[in-house]
Amino acid sequence: DLLDNRSLAMLLEISKRLEEKYSCVKILDKTNSGKANSLNDALKIVDSELIAVTDADSYPKKDSVIKMIGYFEEEGVSAVTSRVLVKNKKNFLEKFQVLDYSIIAWSRKLLDFVDSVYVTNGPLSIYKTSVVKDLGGFDPKNLTEDIEITWHILSVGLKTRMSYSAIVYTTVPSKFDNWVKQRVRWNLGGIQTVRKYYKSLFKNPEHVFGYFVIPYVASAFLLAIIGFLLFSRYLWIKGTYYLFSFIYLFQGYPFFKYLDFSFSLTLLIFFALLFFILSIIQYKLGFKNSETGNKSVLKILVYSVIYRSLYIIPLILALYKLSKGDLRWYTK
């Protein structure tokens, strides 16, 4: 089935061509009410054992679906996701996302080994139809229905898997403002999901969901915020002290001295450096044998220091919007 919710002007026209060419294709034409609502409408007429979901701006490889289906032979597996790679690779932002998506995919595959794949991505994922229907379908109130349905599946003790060999290419934002909007939505949806399922924390020792997935995701949010606050506090104290201490300026004290860091071998600095080095090693391994190639340490350093530092911007904006209860822009 092809579902057109009028989110892309040309989608209906293209879908009709496919419907004319293939007898198995059926179009559901409806006004744009959000992806989750549209998927739920499609669920009402689907009677197959499995349902595959992909986005209009994504391009799965021909053998991707076949490579994913085999995972459902394992008992309890109710959703399988794919490896998402970047299709457009022209400007610097797009190239940074090439690295970003490769690392995300590699990290997600590692989580697969501990039954903790907590996102079945929108570009290409396959679900057991009966399970999704039993769970009430996709949550239309959540901005990231792919995250929410995955957590819902895990919360009832079922499994999710990732096929690293099943590849789908997606079109990523080429402009910074669009990148920020996308990541704000991701952060908002992630926070919504944590708030919805936090009561499962440390419940049912037989399920990894409450003992690993929730703490893992929640701690990632908290560490990012704490790191930002500590860094901001450092700059504020240093900046206020030196900028307003005229005696230092008159004596020739360097104006930007407050930006210098003290690299004394404190326990905090030691663990920070250790974490950074381990991250570089992780990224290096993530690029090995991937379609992005074996990236140089310099490129990984630039990615780690510059691009990853930008992550805090959409997170702060998401928290601000959440504090105002403003989710309207992202649900239009």
Ranges and model annotations:
Residues F72-R108, K141-L143, T150-P215, S219, ...:
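Catalytic donor/gating beta->alpha subdomain of glycosyltransferases that bind UDP-sugars
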Residues N5-R6, D63, E74, S163:
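Acidic/polar residues in short coil/turn loops that connect beta-strands
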Residues L222-Y241:
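Hydrophobic, aromatic-rich transmembrane alpha-helices
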Residues E13, E19-S23, A36-S38, A42, ...:
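Long helical/loop segments within the catalytic core of UDP-sugar-dependent glycosyltransferases
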Residues S38, I149-T150:
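Short, hydrophobic alpha-helical packing/hinge segments within bilobed ligand-binding/sensory domains
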Residues K199-F212, G239-K332:
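Juxtamembrane C-terminal module of membrane proteins
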Residues L2, S58-Y59:
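Acidic metal-phosphate-binding loop of nucleotide-sugar-dependent transferases
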Residues D1-T31:
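Acidic donor-binding segment of Leloir-type glycosyltransferases
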